[in-house]
Amino acid sequence: MGVLARIQGPDDLRQLSHAEMTELADEIREFLVLKVAATGGHLGPNLGVVELTLALHRIFDSPQDAIIFDTGHQAYVHKILTGRQDQFDTLRKQGGLSGYPCRAESEHDWVESSHASAALSYADGLAKAFALTGQNRHVVAVVGDGALTGGMCWEALNNIAAGKDRSVVIVVNDNGRSYAPTIGGLADHLSALRTAPSYERALDSGRRMVKRLPWVGRTAYSVLHGMKAGLKDAVSPQVMFTDLGIKYLGPVDGHDEAAMESALRRAKAYGGPVIVHAVTRKGNGYAHAENDVADQMHATGVIDPVTGRGTKSSAPDWTSVFSAALIEQASRREDIVAITAAMAGPTGLAAFGEKFPDRIFDVGIAEQHAMTSAAGLALGGLHPVVAIYSTFLNRAFDQLLMDVALLKQPVTVVLDRAGVTGVDGASHNGVWDLSLLGIIPGIRVAAPRDADTLREELDEALLVDDGPTVVRFPKGAVPEAIPAVKRLDGMVDVLKASEGERGDVLLVAVGPFASLALEIAERLDKQGISVAVVDPRWVLPVADSLVKMADKYALVVTIEDGGLHGGIGSTVSAAMRAAGVHTSCRDMGVPQQFLDHASREAIHKELGLTAQDLSRKITGWVAGMGSVGVHVQEDASSASAQGEVAQG
């Protein structure tokens, strides 16, 4: 029996010898490669925190002591050590193990958001709560190096530093991609001394003694202290933390488990806020990850664990289509610049950066700053393109509203991973953007249905010079092109026309749900229901031509991949009412709830967003229509209560 098989919880770690700990680290890496290769997931980050996490659970008493992982995708080892190794075959599968910390899974998981830079604020609040309630408990926050580029971390550090007697240990997982190692043995020695309680006592005693000397004493103390501080500043970056009043320990080899234990033990004993700087290597111990120049296998799909290779789809994905289209436009227009929040590769801007290195700005994990910086670029005569995941727009909403839209600045925001994203769970679904964007005065929002309309709508967005524009698209492969039958007033695409001037049902499809709407229309046609399908292209604001067309039908059904409250359906309905159009409306989309992880297809099926379910509902609505002017929102919960969700 291997060592890993004997680990059922953190207590088991404390019984192991140093040799067994080394063996356990090797077994965990082998386990991670085999399991993540089979399911997909965040491989590189977890290979880099094996020894670090082992040391954490040897020194601290979880869950009595709170261990919080920022960017929770680096918590796989934590899950293995807290009794969940037998569930890794279900990682990121419906009903299985989450790819992030999950409070429903284990008492060892304190939080579950995977958005970066939040852990220190959680830690600050927990430490205050423990102090106020008289609980002698430690708080540990594991912060990925990239997270420290987010302003929220520094807001939290400012507050943590004020709690001199509150035990908060901040482990900076520095994998070398953002921070340079601290220089020299003197820096190591000073760091070790300044975190030792005995040194603090000696320093306090010396300070009092020197200051009690005649008038020269205070001056001598200031000079000596200044010399030491100046020398320290010259050789070490830790001054940024010590100047805040937070003790710094490091750098520590994050792959030396014994060294990590020693550092964490001293940090724990200090009794106040301490930073432990652990230098790690992303993908450590797996050659294919170590040699992956792009991102050390940060996130993978299903791969062969021996070769490290996965099966790539031959179909282009939305991100690559956007990337090529932006480069084409930027080749013609020198005013186009790009902004990424530490995600140039995932959002398709890496190729742009290679071609135009002086016209791309990586602002770190700082979406708020990205948006206002974009406003500044626009004020300076440029047209910035901010490419972020839809779920991260939440953080930049105030800046988009007040710093971009209020000033009517031409900033184009490209939202990747819009709609249901699936396996990464509740925190990564991009289902909030349309509800948020709908309240911004003057904003224009496009939702392309295929590659051709993505290129076209991006081009149109880049021509707007009097306010912000948004282009949103989902994760994954681009569907086949869907040609329009005709275009109304240069705005709305009619994908299927009904026979005659009037019809029964008008389906309004948002973005890639166009193909779903056409499939529904085919089913309804067979039942003798007259149907037309339109793609608004620009879903905000609602086009007058769409409202006029709605007046010719008995029922309008909107189908969208975002939240129903404040979504496109309710916006279309409001536009119809304002124009005096009394056609009945039904909205189909995502309920306002946090969706558990599963494949996109499984989630859509669970929500009733399938051709079978929707055609069945629409048939029932048409058959039962006895009134007009009714606006009804439908989601999974209400449909289930009425028995309308298909079970097959």
Swiss-Prot record:
Name its GO BP terms in alphabetical order.
1-deoxy-D-xylulose 5-phosphate biosynthetic process; isopentenyl diphosphate biosynthetic process, methylerythritol 4-phosphate pathway; terpenoid biosynthetic process; thiamine biosynthetic process
Q: Which InterPro entries match?
A: Dxylulose-5-P_synthase, THDP-binding, Transketo_C/PFOR_II, Transketolase-like_Pyr-bd, Transketolase_BS, Transketolase_C
User: Which keywords label this protein?
Assistant: Isoprene biosynthesis, Magnesium, Metal-binding, Thiamine biosynthesis, Thiamine pyrophosphate, Transferase
Per its record, the protein catalyses: D-glyceraldehyde 3-phosphate + pyruvate + H(+) = 1-deoxy-D-xylulose 5-phosphate + CO2
Q: Does the keyword Metal-binding apply?
A: yes
EC nos: 2.2.1.7
**A GO molecular-function descriptor:** thiamine pyrophosphate binding
Where along the chain is thiamine diphosphate bound?
H73, S114, H115, A116, G146, A147, N175, Y286, E367
Q: Detail which positions bind Mg(2+).
A: D145, N175
CDD domains (alphabetical): TPP_DXS (cd02007), TPP_PYR_DXS_TK_like (cd07033)
A GO-annotated cellular component: cytosol
Cofactor(s) essential for the protein: Mg(2+); thiamine diphosphate
* UniProt pathway: Metabolic intermediate biosynthesis; 1-deoxy-D-xylulose 5-phosphate biosynthesis; 1-deoxy-D-xylulose 5-phosphate from D-glyceraldehyde 3-phosphate and pyruvate: step 1/1
User: Key word Flavoprotein present in the record?
Assistant: no
Q: How is the cofactor bound?
A: Binds 1 Mg(2+) ion per subunit.
Matching entries from Pfam families are given as: DXP_synthase_N, Transket_pyr, Transketolase_C
Q: Describe its partners and assembly state.
A: Homodimer.
**Protein family according to the UniProt entry:** Belongs to the transketolase family. DXPS subfamily.
Role description: Catalyzes the acyloin condensation reaction between C atoms 2 and 3 of pyruvate and glyceraldehyde 3-phosphate to yield 1-deoxy-D-xylulose-5-phosphate (DXP).
Name of the protein this chain belongs to: 1-deoxy-D-xylulose-5-phosphate synthase
Question: What species is this protein from?
Answer: Rhodococcus erythropolis (strain PR4 / NBRC 100887)
